[in-house]
């Protein structure tokens, strides 16, 4: 399989800089505006209300789940509902104890600290975070060698909200210090339809119901993908100048242009399935081997591609590696000839 299929790709879960402003405008600001994840919303509402009644900061919270389900949005909502400001950072940006110390010492009383990809923090920073979360203080080492001393630094009370796509990589002592942990689930087509209806209203798009329904079923169970496909469909509607109202026919034409198929697979999804079939005879194949062949990070494949393919029944994980299913062969039109060479239509 030619690898140039991955060049200049547009992964539906990636957020480009020119889309951040639009995405921010579509973000719900309060729990009442947030569609889906009802159990998590109710639990967060209780957490926030209890903290207000007791006059303390909200408990630390860990939000886990695949990309694009609303972890960052929920963190911003928690800050808004608590009436406090939010400071945003990420695990890869906190690699030294000094990085974390500077961040924590600058927090205002009651402020919410959001750390995305918290599982990617360095171990030394994680260990400093234990004491900060539990006692609102950190120990600063002064001096070097045998004469070095530890000086305690008191911190303003704060709330930490961590987000992760790989909760299993967090050490137990860190997970245990979160007072609340939630896993966000993929959305149903019906929930995604509600997301699209709200976004279409904010974007002032006129539509027929079946147009949004056709986008919802192709949105991979992910609101970020749903909103991205809606923006791309709106672009197609404006450029084609064929109608002022978004119809199902126009939506499907836009999906064809952006290479999103009936199950919501994009180019990279199909490239993974093609690679396993063409190069590795349908599998099983190890993630490192697959990553090297595709020229794509293993973490991207594991976090952004595999969950949806597994959920759709197109891919299975076995002790020996990844393997495509009969459903994937049927959907992709893969064929095996009698000579043992595998072909696809």
UniProtKB/Swiss-Prot annotation:
Homohexamer. Forms an RuvA(8)-RuvB(12)-Holliday junction (HJ) complex. HJ DNA is sandwiched between 2 RuvA tetramers; dsDNA enters through RuvA and exits via RuvB. An RuvB hexamer assembles on each DNA strand where it exits the tetramer. Each RuvB hexamer is contacted by two RuvA subunits (via domain III) on 2 adjacent RuvB subunits; this complex drives branch migration. In the full resolvosome a probable DNA-RuvA(4)-RuvB(12)-RuvC(2) complex forms which resolves the HJ. Its EC number is 3.6.4.-. DNA binds at residues 317, 322. Pfam families: AAA_lid_4, RuvB_C, RuvB_N. Residues 188-259 are annotated as: Small ATPAse domain (RuvB-S). It is found in: Cytoplasm. This is Holliday junction branch migration complex subunit RuvB. GO terms for biological process: DNA recombination; DNA repair. Residues 262-345 are annotated as: Head domain (RuvB-H). Has 3 domains, the large (RuvB-L) and small ATPase (RuvB-S) domains and the C-terminal head (RuvB-H) domain. The head domain binds DNA, while the ATPase domains jointly bind ATP, ADP or are empty depending on the state of the subunit in the translocation cycle. During a single DNA translocation step the structure of each domain remains the same, but their relative positions change. ATP binds at residues 26-27, 68, 71-73, 134-136, 177, 187, 224. InterPro entries: AAA+_ATPase, AAA_lid_4, DNA_helicase_Holl-junc_RuvB, P-loop_NTPase, RuvB-like_N, RuvB_C, WH-like_DNA-bd_sf, WH_DNA-bd_sf. Belongs to the RuvB family. One of its GO terms (cellular component) is Holliday junction resolvase complex. It catalyses: ATP + H2O = ADP + phosphate + H(+). Residues 3-187 are annotated as: Large ATPase domain (RuvB-L). One of its GO terms (molecular function) is ATP binding. Mg(2+) binds at residue 72. Keywords: ATP-binding, Cytoplasm, DNA damage, DNA recombination, DNA repair, DNA-binding, Hydrolase, Nucleotide-binding. The RuvA-RuvB-RuvC complex processes Holliday junction (HJ) DNA during genetic recombination and DNA repair, while the RuvA-RuvB complex plays an important role in the rescue of blocked DNA replication forks via replication fork reversal (RFR). RuvA specifically binds to HJ cruciform DNA, conferring on it an open structure. The RuvB hexamer acts as an ATP-dependent pump, pulling dsDNA into and through the RuvAB complex. RuvB forms 2 homohexamers on either side of HJ DNA bound by 1 or 2 RuvA tetramers; 4 subunits per hexamer contact DNA at a time. Its main location: cytoplasm. The gene is ruvB.
